[in-house]
């Protein structure tokens, strides 16, 4: 490649490792005439994690292709999305994001002087922008706005108006930043197509949209800021990185939903153009790969062991994180991190004495500790013909004993080694002399011919994976549900099986990171 890349070489750099491009022909035309103007925006909500290296590596590609790149710190969006960033923390979050993202870019050798950094509220509160928000609201339907934000904005039963404004503001950003293209994750696709539909209604042109794939988290599926064990924080200590990688989902030979392999593909290879598997001489010694697919093929063939893969990623990842940790090891940035993300347990000191006038506890699904389980053994209860006693692996050191009344409905052979859904924080109780340490959740149709089916996690799920209601991923479950408060009973009243056999709470899906919880056939059934 010469000093100035050709339009074809620029196109390759811009689009490599992307999952989808909308408007590729327009992109080609622009590259024939001039440099591409592009922006990447990030809402300043939770702490950035290592998956942010995916857009960082693409920003490096854009700069190599000669693009003019703007990074938007979308502080107003962070507030509009169900107040994921409280108003009083917006400035602090923006400062944290700016420092940590600049540190990430420096760690991969990206020259900061070639980038433009801008804060959303620097222009989104202007008279012109505000007028365009009103103009847009006069042509956009509620349906289209909600649909556009479905993969990005927190989904709740009664959405706030702020969340419905979010997609429109993101569309307007393309015009007000004067760019040709917007770059983001494939989870932004509906917002991108929303922008393509509605910007012309205001007399503005369609933009090109570039989408990178979502990197699976360490437990499978999308890496999430709200799922602690699925992500590695940029400031995690080396021992924490090793611990999380050790627990990562990485089955021998399995290349699907493999967050470890995906991180190598989308971050380490684009940055270094090679990856070294570090291993003992007894197992063949170190091996250098210069093409990702060669590594994937060897892993699929079990030539590369998961332990060696994880150890090698551990070394490579810590080389990226070391400069970031070093930068944040100053009193000023330590103080910033603490102020931008205050410890919730220290925000409100406990009042002395009983809190008689305190507000009632919120009854929400995140209070339930529901997990994927695998039935290890199943036997008839020694003293009850209608009960099974199961030993179920729910991701703990020892399997739990669970008693369930399924003898009349599910043959023993169908339960053995089956993946199930278990409620784990009910108070243990004895059932005919055997203590049950959880509840195996099932769909049921009541009546004379009662039918019962255990709920099914998505294929590929692992014992211990958290089950949550979409939109309620955050929050820690109660350590133990207090029987007198009837939290489970109140929530259970809105549990239902949909017409598509999906388990739901108030018409919102129960999920793991791999997809929705379902049952075999009991449409419209209850869940207990």
UniProtKB/Swiss-Prot annotation:
Motif 'HIGH' region, residue numbers: 44-52
Pfam families in the cross-refs: tRNA-synt_1b (PF00579), tRNA_bind (PF01588)
GO cellular component, one term: nucleus
InterPro entries for the chain: aa-tRNA-synth_Ic, NA-bd_OB-fold, Rossmann-like_a/b/a_fold, tRNA-bd_dom, Tyr-tRNA-ligase, Tyrosine-tRNA_ligase_regulator
Keywords: Acetylation, Aminoacyl-tRNA synthetase, ATP-binding, Cytoplasm, Ligase, Nucleotide-binding, Nucleus, Phosphoprotein, Protein biosynthesis, RNA-binding, tRNA-binding
Residue numbers covered by motif Nuclear localization signal: 242-247
Region (Disordered): 339-363
Residues bearing the modification N6-acetyllysine: 197, 206, 474, 482, 490
Binding site for L-tyrosine: 39, 166, 170, 173, 188
Residues with N-acetylmethionine modification: 1
Coiled coil spans: none
Top-rank taxon: Eukaryota
Binding site for trans-resveratrol: 39, 170, 173
MF-aspect GO terms: ATP binding; small molecule binding; tRNA binding; tyrosine-tRNA ligase activity
One of the GO BP terms on file: tyrosyl-tRNA aminoacylation
Main localization of the protein described in the UniProt heading: cytoplasm
Domain notes: The nuclear localization signal, which mediates localization to the nucleus, is also important for interacting with tRNA(Tyr), suggesting that it is sterically blocked when tRNA(Tyr) is bound.
Protein family: Belongs to the class-I aminoacyl-tRNA synthetase family.
Subunit structure: Homodimer. Interacts (when binding to resveratrol) with PARP1; interaction stimulates the poly-ADP-ribosyltransferase activity of PARP1.
Function of the protein: Tyrosine--tRNA ligase that catalyzes the attachment of tyrosine to tRNA(Tyr) in a two-step reaction: tyrosine is first activated by ATP to form Tyr-AMP and then transferred to the acceptor end of tRNA(Tyr). Also acts as a positive regulator of poly-ADP-ribosylation in the nucleus, independently of its tyrosine--tRNA ligase activity. Activity is switched upon resveratrol-binding: resveratrol strongly inhibits the tyrosine--tRNA ligase activity and promotes relocalization to the nucleus, where YARS1 specifically stimulates the poly-ADP-ribosyltransferase activity of PARP1.
Annotated protein name in UniProt: Tyrosine--tRNA ligase, cytoplasmic
The encoding gene: YARS1
